[in-house]
Amino acid sequence: MKNKEDYCCVIPNKLYFGNKILAKDETRLRKLGIKSIIDLINYENSSQEIKHSKDFNFLHLSIEDVPTNNADWAEEGSNFIEEQIKNNNPVYVHCSQGISRSSTLIMHYLMTREKQNLKTAFFKLKDLRNIIDPTTGFMKSLSNLDEKLFGKKSFTIEEYSLFCLKESFPDIDESEIKDIYEQNKKFYSLNNDIYLK
């Protein structure tokens, strides 16, 4: 069964992530001890933005959730998380559904600040909130960061794509999944070099 809770806790009393439902409920945020919020939603107009009282520290990064986007924006978010945690201000990171943008930022933070490789960070979050599904562009950026930080890619784009296919089609055996992947490689890729390991 998929974990569809509004949020999950990554580091107790320090770091949480999820969807916009919790972000709109300041009473629940306060009960969790949240003092800082990162909003990653790309609003079509400012009237849609979630407003927060001034007692929350707030960062809004307007990020489009499309496969062609990279995750270069995540460093600014990780800096904010690091600073807030240092000042004992627990952080809630959210996007619209708590599936792609927020999980990307949390993985970036775990990789750059907690020294976890991409595979470890991804499966940690998958265990906490199994509906996470970062875009291929975000994962490509994190995979490149993985290699930069740790000297090799712990979780390649090909491995991620195969994992996603297997999760979508659990009754199909692995060899058939690989055949589907190879036949549809262009469909699942952003460009021809995305599958280079």
Label each residue range with its predicted role:
Residues K2-V93, Q97, T112-N144, L149-G151:
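Cysteine-based protein phosphatase catalytic domain of the PTP/DSP
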Residues L105-I106, A121, S161, L165:
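Generic structural signal for hydrophobic residues
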Residues D25, M107, K186-F187:
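Short, solvent-exposed helix-helix connector turns and helix-capping sites enriched
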Residues S103-T112:
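Short, small-residue alpha-helix embedded
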Residues K126, S143-K197:
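Short, amphipathic alpha-helical interaction segments embedded in low-complexity terminal/linker regions
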Residues S100:
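Short functional micro-motifs and their immediate structural scaffolds
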